[in-house]
A protein has these predicted regions:
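Accessory terminal and edge-of-domain segments that mediate assembly/interaction
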Residues: 1-311
Length: 311
């Protein structure tokens, strides 16, 4: 029983010489894994019993480099990222390739520009915790009895905090003999955990966070930011496209149509622990302001989680 599990059909690793095809394969593998877990979860909630574990896994990207030096004539040689420092095998797991599409595409492109060769994309051995497969507005566990919820751990992988430390980002991670070097500061599971915590702490979806983030513990700064945000939405010539408040309450700039998920926004009965407000501009170039309240623990918590967005 423990050695067997119900998984998506095996997909062999593929090699890519351009960023777009690598990203498309990552997206396809990730979606296959999500579909597998979501379908099994629907069956589990409706009463189906499984005699094996149900598992699906994060996609990975891997690169083998023969030298650490950048390719001669690379347009990206002046950047401080997008390359590896020494020869070897580098690998990382990936998640939410929809949310991170532009980021992943740029990183893939730079790796190929800087080192040549191919990117290898495949299915990793890192299981996706079933909670991280739910769509944002799914509230599946609420439909189950306590006994059924307890049984979940026998069937599905649950979040494992031991697999989510910050050893890579802190520079303390040492790969074992035969293991690849890390290709990213954060593993997919660590990123998924932070994306979930961002929703909880800020009251807004991770997709709304902008690349310029301000932190404050003074409410009057937030009040002024909210005033400026609504003011910008009344200006048809503003470069800002939307203003997002806790509960994913979206105000679009005058003249712009509402989008599908806008209707799901709802003012929460009470503000979350660290409310987030987002003045949205094209390509995430707007401003996010977070009220971190009091205490250094809040500041460390929220920055640890926003870090996975690579603002």
């Amino acid at each position: 029983y423990r050695g067997m599990s119900i998984r998506p059909p095996f997909t062999a690793p593929t090699r890519h010489t351009d960023a777009d095809s690598a990203l498309a394969q990552v997206q396809a593998l990730y979606q296959t894994s999500l579909d597998h877990l979501r379908q099994a979860m629907r069956e589990f909630v409706s009463g189906t019993n499984f005699d094996q574990r149900v598992r699906a896994f994060y996609p990975f990207v891997r690169i083998h480099t023969k030298h650490g030096a950048l390719k001669a004539g690379s347009d990206a040689a002046h950047l401080s990222y997008g390359f590896v420092a020494e020869p070897g095998r580098y690998e990382t797991t990936l998640t939410h390739p929809d949310l991170f599409a532009a980021y992943y595409r740029e990183q893939f492109d730079l790796l190929l520009q800087n080192h040549g060769g191919t990117l290898e994309v495949g299915v990793s051995h890192q299981p996706i915790p079933v909670h991280f497969s739910f769509a944002e507005n799914d509230h599946i566990e609420g439909e189950m009895s306590e006994e059924r919820r307890q049984l979940m751990r026998e069937v599905f992988d649950l979040p494992d905090l031991k697999a989510m430390d910050d050893g890579i980002a802190n520079g303390t991670f040492e790969p074992k003999a035969g293991e690849p070097q890390p290709l990213s500061l954060f593993t997919a599971a660590r990123m998924d955990y932070s994306l979930q915590r961002l929703r909880h702490y800020s009251g807004t979806s991770p997709e709304h966070f902008q690349n310029y983030v301000l932190f404050t513990n003074y409410q009057f700064y937030i009040d002024e930011f909210v005033r400026l945000g609504h003011e910008a939405m009344q200006d048809p010539n503003s470069e800002y496209l939307a203003f997002v408040e806790p509960g994913n309450v979206v105000t679009r700039r005058v003249g712009l149509p509402a989008e599908a998920n806008d209707a799901l926004g709802k003012v929460p009965p009470r503000l979350p622990q660290m409310p987030g407000y987002h003045l949205v501009r094209a390509n995430h170039t707007g401003i996010t302001m977070v009220n971190i309240g009091v205490g250094p623990a809040n500041a460390k918590n929220i920055t640890d989680h926003i870090a996975v967005l690579r603002p």
